[in-house]
UniProtKB/Swiss-Prot annotation:
It comes from Pelagibacter ubique (strain HTCC1062). Acts as a chaperone. Residues 623-632 have a biased composition (Acidic residues). Induction: By stress conditions e.g. heat shock. Pfam families: HSP70. This is Chaperone protein DnaK. Coiled coil: none annotated. Keywords: ATP-binding, Chaperone, Nucleotide-binding, Phosphoprotein, Stress response. Disulfide bonds: none annotated.
Length: 647
C-alpha cells in the first residue's frame, strides 16, 4: 500500500512529512534542507526551477521568478488584496478569461494552482526518493481562514501534481495534532499561526485523543511578506531621501531589496542591530549608487507594529466565539516563521497573560500534523479524533439582497443543514440560488461562491411553493448545495466551484502538461549527463593521445582523431542520440590506445631484474602449480631461517 504523505504548502516555504512508526518525520529535499522555498522560476533556456535553485537566481531573473503564489490562489483579479500584490510583485499578475488572478512568465500564463502544483511535485519527489516508491496520495494543509474557492484551488493543485488529495486540513489544527499527539491531559490551547502570507488563530480542546476545534479566525493576507514589503518601503524611502532616486520601477533593485529586507528581519530576531549593505543598487550620471545603512531591532519593531497589532482582533474574536477568556487558555502554541520575532512573542504574551509555548518547530510542525492526519486515514495512527470547523458562515441570497445564513461559522464539520424557502413572485417558474460565504448581513458584502437555477416550478401564488435548500460541507471544508421543489420533486445539485475556478477540462490539461514537463525535464537531465560524459571522454582521449600517441599506428591514431572531431560536432547540436552514438564510436576507436597504454605500463612494472635475464624465456617442466599463503615476516632471523630451509 502506497504511503500517504503530509504536505505543508506554505507561502514562503513548503515541507513534507511521513509517519515512521508512531512519530512524524520531516524529509530532507535534494538540496539537503527540511524546508523548500515556495519559489518557481522559468529561465532563459526554458528550464523550470523549483525551490532553492529558483530562489538563488531571483535577483538576475525577477520577472520570471514566482513567489508567494499562495496569496493569489482562489482569488479574483479584482480582489483588493490582489491589487496590493500587483503593486509589490516583480512578476506579472494578469487577469484570466474567467476573471481570476493568474501569473505570466516567459509569455505563458499560469494559474496559481499550476505554480503550486510545481511545488507539490517537488514535495512528492522528495518523499518518493526517501521511500523508494511512487507516492499518489496526500494530506495538504491550508490556512484555517481559507474560503471554499481557495480550498478548491489547493485541491486542484494537488490533482495537477499527480496527487489524490485525501484531506485538506487547517494549518493550526495540523499544528495542534503534532503538539498534542503524546499529551494525555485535557487542555485548552490557542494556536497562533503567523506564516509567510497568512495569519490564523484557532482555539482547541485537547483530551483523550480528541482534538476539537472550538473556533477559528484570521487574515489570509497578513504574514512575513507584508513585513518584508514594509522594510522594502522604508529602504526605498531612505535611499530616495539621500539620492533623490525612486527605486520602485527598478525590478532588479526591488528583488535585491526584498532579499535584503528578509535577511535583516531574520537577523534582528537574534541581534539588536544589522547592516543593510547593497552596493551598486543603481546609477545616475554622477556614477553608481549604494545602500549602506544600519537598522536596529527597535526601528524594525516600530515599522511593523501595525502589522503585529492586526493579529490581535482575530484572537479576541476566536476567544469570544469559543466562549472563553484569555486566562482560561492553558497553552499558546506558536506556529510559522514570523513567531520567532521577539516583538510578536511579547505581544502574544501580553494578550494572553502567559508565556507562549515554543516547544514545536514553527517551520515543520504543520507538515508533521498533516503526516499524523495521513496516518489516521491510513489506519497507522489509532485513537485520534479530529473535529474541525468551518471558518465562515454559509448561506444564500434572499429577497432584498439579504444574506440568509444556513450554517454558522465555527460549526463542526462534516455537516449538513436544510431550510425551506419560497418564491418571491406569483407563478414564478424558476429560482436562482446564489451561494454566499461570509459574516456580513447583505449578500453583496459577502463572497459569492457560485450560483445555479432550479427550473420547472409549478405555477402558484408567491410564497406557496416549497423550495428546500440543503448545504453539505465535507471534512475538507468543501461545500455542496442542492435545491429541491418539494411539490414536483425536481432537484438541482452542485459542488461549489469558484466562479472563475478551473474547470475539470482545464485541470486535466494541466495534469497532462505536468506529466509532459516531467518527461521533458528527464530528457533535459539526460541530455546534460550525456554531454558531460562526452566532454570527459574527449578531454581524457586528447590527453592520452598527446602523451601516448606514438604507441599506436598512424591508422589507429587517425581513427581516434576523426572520432573526436565527429563527437565535437555532435556536441554543438541538440541531438542527444547522435552524441551517444558518436561517444560510443570514440570509445571503440580509443580501445587500441588504451591497450597500448596498459601494455606499456605492465611492461614497465613487470620488467625482470638484471640477474634473471638469462632465465627469461626458459620453461621449467618441473614447475608445479601450488596454493600459497602470504606470511608476514616477523624478524630478520626468521627470514634467514626460511632461506636456509628452502635451500
Amino acid at each position: 500500500m502506497s504511503k500517504i504523505i503530509g504536505i505543508d504548502l506554505g507561502t514562503t516555504n513548503s515541507c513534507v512529512s511521513i509517519m515512521e512508526g508512531s512519530q512524524p518525520k520531516v524529509l530532507e529535499n535534494a538540496e539537503g534542507a527540511r524546508t523548500t522555498p515556495s519559489v518557481v522560476a522559468f529561465t532563459e533556456d526554458g528550464e523550470k526551477l523549483v525551490g532553492q535553485p529558483a530562489k538563488r537566481q531571483a535577483v538576475t531573473n525577477p520577472e520570471n521568478t514566482i513567489f508567494a503564489v499562495k496569496r493569489l490562489i482562489g482569488r479574483s483579479f479584482e480582489d483588493p488584496t490582489v491589487k496590493k500584490d500587483i503593486a509589490a510583485a516583480p512578476f506579472k499578475i494578469v487577469n484570466s478569461e474567467k476573471g481570476d488572478a493568474w501569473i505570466e512568465a516567459k509569455g505563458e500564463k499560469y494559474s496559481p494552482s499550476q505554480i503550486s502544483a510545481f511545488i507539490l511535485q517537488k514535495m512528492k519527489e522528495t518523499a518518493e526518493k526517501y521511500l523508494g516508491q511512487e507516492v499518489t496520495k496526500a494530506v495538504i494543509t491550508v490556512p484555517a481562514y481559507f474560503n471554499d474557492a481557495q480550498r478548491q484551488a489547493t485541491k486542484d493543485a494537488g490533482k495537477i501534481a499527480g496527487l489524490e488529495v485525501l484531506r485538506i486540513i487547517n494549518e493550526p489544527t495540523a499544528a495542534s495534532l503534532a503538539y498534542g499527539l503524546d499529551k494525555k491531559q485535557n487542555k485548552k490551547i490557542a494556536v497562533y499561526d503567523l506564516g509567510g502570507g497568512t495569519f490564523d488563530v484557532s482555539i482547541l480542546e485537547l483530551g483523550d485523543g480528541v482534538f476539537e476545534v472550538k473556533s477559528t479566525n484570521g487574515d489570509t493576507f497578513l504574514g512575513g511578506e507584508d513585513f518584508d514589503n514594509t522594510i522594502v518601503d522604508y529602504l526605498i524611502g531612505e535611499f530616495k531621501k539621500d539620492s533623490g532616486i525612486d527605486l520602485r520601477s527598478d525590478k532588479l533593485a526591488l528583488q535585491r531589496l526584498k532579499e535584503a529586507a528578509e535577511k535583516a528581519k531574520i537577523e534582528l530576531s537574534s541581534a539588536e542591530q544589522t547592516d543593510v549593505n547593497l552596493p551598486f543598487i543603481t546609477a545616475d550620471k554622477t556614477g553608481p549608487k549604494h545602500i549602506n545603512l544600519k537598522m536596529t531591532r527597535a526601528k524594525l519593531e516600530a515599522l511593523v507594529e501595525d502589522l503585529i497589532s492586526r493579529t490581535l482582533p482575530p484572537c479576541k474574536t476566536a476567544l469570544k466565539d469559543a466562549g472563553l477568556t484569555a486566562s482560561e487558555i492553558d497553552e499558546i502554541v506558536m506556529v510559522g516563521g514570523m513567531t520567532r520575532m521577539p516583538k510578536v512573542l511579547s505581544e502574544v504574551k501580553n494578550f494572553f497573560g502567559k508565556e507562549p509555548n515554543k516547544s514545536v518547530n514553527p517551520d515543520e510542525v504543520v507538515a508533521m500534523g498533516a503526516a499524523i492526519q495521513a496516518g489516521v486515514l491510513q489506519g497507522d495512527v489509532k485513537d485520534v479524533l479530529l473535529l474541525d470547523v468551518t471558518p465562515l458562515s454559509l448561506g444564500i441570497e434572499t429577497l432584498g439582497g439579504v444574506s440568509t445564513k444556513l450554517i454558522e461559522k465555527n460549526t463542526t464539520i462534516p455537516t449538513k443543514k436544510s431550510q425551506v424557502f419560497s418564491t418571491a413572485d406569483d407563478n414564478q417558474p424558476a429560482v436562482s440560488i446564489r451561494v454566499l460565504q461570509g459574516e456580513r448581513e447583505m449578500a453583496s458584502d459577502n463572497k459569492m461562491l457560485g450560483n445555479f437555477e432550479l427550473v420547472g416550478i409549478a405555477p402558484a401564488p408567491r410564497g406557496v411553493p416549497q423550495i428546500e435548500v440543503t448545504f453539505d460541507i465535507d471534512a475538507n471544508g468543501i461545500v455542496s448545495v442542492s435545491a429541491k421543489d418539494k411539490g414536483t420533486g425536481k432537484e438541482q445539485k452542485i459542488q461549489i466551484q469558484a466562479s472563475g475556478g478551473l474547470s475539470d477540462e482545464e485541470i486535466e490539461k494541466m495534469v497532462k502538461d505536468a506529466e509532459a514537463n516531467k518527461e521533458e525535464d528527464k530528457k533535459k537531465r539526460e541530455s546534460v549527463d550525456v554531454r558531460n560524459q562526452a566532454d570527459t571522454l574527449l578531454h581524457s582521449t586528447e590527453k592520452n593521445l598527446k602523451e601516448h600517441g606514438a604507441k599506436v599506428s598512424d591508422a589507429d591514431k587517425k581513427a581516434i582523431e576523426d572520432a573526436s572531431t565527429d563527437l565535437k560536432e555532435a556536441i554543438k547540436g541538440t541531438d542527444t542520440e547522435e552524441i551517444k552514438k558518436k561517444t560510443e564510436t570514440l570509445v571503440q576507436a580509443s580501445m587500441k590506445l588504451g591497450e597500448a597504454i596498459y601494455k606499456s605500463q605492465e611492461k614497465k612494472e613487470g620488467s625482470p631484474k638484471e640477474g634473471d635475464k638469462n632465465d627469461e624465456g626458459k620453461k621449467d617442466d618441473n614447475v608445479v602449480d601450488a596454493d600459497f599463503e602470504e606470511v608476514k615476516e616477523e624478524s630478520k632471523e626468521g627470514k634467514e631461517e626460511d632461506k636456509e630451509k628452502s635451500a
